[in-house]
């Protein structure tokens, strides 16, 4: 899903039963805390956050100043491959928005 840092969904789809607008609305609070942690630890702004849940992963990646990418993965997904692709194509994705 692509969303604004304000939590408004720009484009996205999810598995049946998941509400993309609701998911997008939940991301800004997480990003705000991650940005705060980056400032407090002097590590800079957030590029990518990886959350491991019991039944999968949530990846939040900054695309541009005001846009984010949210990817939901099953536990069996190739996490390393996805992170590589996000880093590699981040600029390309951002240019499409």
Briefly describe each language-model feature range.
Residues 6-97:
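Acidic, low-complexity cytosolic segments
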């Amino acid at each position: 899903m692509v969303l604004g840092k304000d939590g408004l969904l720009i484009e996205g789809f999810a598995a049946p039963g998941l509400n993309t607008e609701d998911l997008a609305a939940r991301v800004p609070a997480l990003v705000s805390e991650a940005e705060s942690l980056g400032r407090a630890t002097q590590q800079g702004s957030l590029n990518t956050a990886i959350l491991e849940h019991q039944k999968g992963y949530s990846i939040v990646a900054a695309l541009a100043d005001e846009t984010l990418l949210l990817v939901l993965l099953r536990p069996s997904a190739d996490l390393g491959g996805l992170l590589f692709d996000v880093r590699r194509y981040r600029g390309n994705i951002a240019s499409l928005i």
